[in-house]
Structures are given as C-alpha cells and as structure tokens.
C-alpha cells in the first residue's frame, strides 16, 4: 500500500456481503451488492490513487455479531472510510417477538461500536446506512405489522 492508497471498508450483514468470495478471486471478492457497485465507481473515478476496497459483510449478522468481530474485521484494517449497513437481522429478531428491550440493546451496541471506532481510529470517516425492509417475500404477508413496529 502506498502513502496515497486509501482503504475503504464495507461492513454489515447479507446486504453488504452480497455473496462475496472468501478467497482472492477478484471477480467475487467484493460480492455483488452495493459494495461492488460503489467500489467500481470509486475505483474508476480515483484509479490513479489505487484505493483498496474490502468487504467484510457477513450474511445473517446482527449488531452483536458485528461487534464480536469488530477488532479483527474493522479496527485492524485501519480504514480511511468505513461504511456500515447493519440492523435488518436485528429487525427480524424483533418481529419474532423476542424479549422487550431488543431495540435498546441494538442501539447501545451500535453506539458503543461507533464510539469505540472513533476513539481508536479518530480520522476514519464513517458512512452509516439505515437498515431497511422491502415489501416482498416474507414481509409482504404481515406488511402493516412490520410498518407499525418499525415506525415506533
């Protein structure tokens, strides 16, 4: 890595994972999600700077899973820019009628993860993406309940 190269890290759940490869195959290393699309655009636009794009999204992760692997899969990579999209699986768990307070635990864990990151990597820029649910498949049947619970 040269002095000019910037590390751009994508973190999150399956939406970030996008079926990424777990080896060095350049055709699949970033997956086929928004991380790939953004890396393609920025890689082209800033080709002379040779940015390094890393995708560490893991399908099925909740914020607690992300926090458990944070040192290895985020802090140690020392990203210049860190994009996080997490929370869809947490929302699913809330809809499964898990114990009260799940929303509070999600918020506390996420805030702790972010504050720890800013403490250890104060110059890292953060891009936080809001988790979302689409009205399709499993959510379509109970869409009004999803909307009501997620909007509160």
Label each residue range with its predicted role:
Residues 22-30, 139-144:
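Short, flexible/disordered intra-domain loops and linkers
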């Amino acid at each position: 890595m040269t002095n000019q190269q910037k590390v751009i890290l994508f973190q999150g759940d399956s939406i970030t994972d996008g079926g990424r490869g777990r080896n060095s195959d350049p055709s699949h290393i970033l997956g086929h999600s928004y991380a790939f699309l953004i890396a393609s655009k920025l890689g082209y636009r800033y080709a002379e700077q040779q940015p390094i794009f890393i995708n560490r999204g893991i399908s099925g992760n909740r914020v607690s899973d992300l926090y458990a692997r944070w040192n290895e899969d985020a802090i140690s990579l020392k990203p210049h820019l860190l994009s996080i999209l997490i929370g869809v699986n947490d929302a699913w768990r809330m809809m499964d009628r898990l114990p009260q307070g799940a929303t509070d635990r999600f918020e506390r864990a996420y805030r702790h993860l972010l504050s720890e990151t800013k403490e250890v990597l104060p110059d890292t820029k953060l891009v936080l993406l809001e988790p979302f649910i689409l009205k399709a498949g499993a959510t379509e049947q109970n869409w009004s309940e999803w909307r009501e619970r997620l909007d509160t």
